[in-house]
């Protein structure tokens, strides 16, 4: 099945502590059904120093994966979250916004 949300897409968070925030998808974890969104769902990780690799220890913030059902593609023309469909144009399968019918970049 084709992915409705792909890397580099701009998405809006639908649920959770970051509801309403927008960000760019940095990674899609297809087998787990999760996405990593830049600057969203940040968690603190306590990291031990690794002198052999020259890494300092401390507390770092990093993005945690969130379920793909908790984000929606952001339609900048409409200014809101939108659903995505697929259609065939010129022999290629393309994504389009269901509310406006225009193609996703």
Swiss-Prot record:
One of its GO terms (cellular component) is ribosome. The keyword Hydrolase does not apply. GO terms for biological process: translation. It comes from the Bacteria. Gene3D superfamilies: 2.30.30.30. Keywords: Ribonucleoprotein, Ribosomal protein, RNA-binding, rRNA-binding. GO terms for molecular function: rRNA binding; structural constituent of ribosome. PANTHER family: MITOCHONDRIAL RIBOSOMAL PROTEIN L24. HAMAP family: Ribosomal_uL24_B. Belongs to the universal ribosomal protein uL24 family. Part of the 50S ribosomal subunit. This is Large ribosomal subunit protein uL24. It comes from Aeromonas salmonicida (strain A449).
């Amino acid at each position: 099945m084709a992915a409705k949300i792909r890397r580099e897409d701009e998405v809006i968070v639908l649920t959770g502590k970051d509801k309403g925030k927008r960000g760019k998808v940095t990674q899609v974890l297809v087998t787990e059904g999760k996405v990593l969104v830049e600057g969203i769902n940040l968690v603190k990780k306590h990291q031990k120093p690794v002198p052999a690799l020259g890494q300092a220890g401390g507390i770092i913030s990093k993005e945690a994966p969130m379920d793909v059902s908790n984000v929606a593609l952001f339609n900048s023309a409409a200014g809101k979250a939108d659903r995505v469909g697929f259609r065939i144009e010129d022999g290629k399968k393309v994504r389009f916004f269901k509310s406006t019918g225009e193609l996703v970049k």
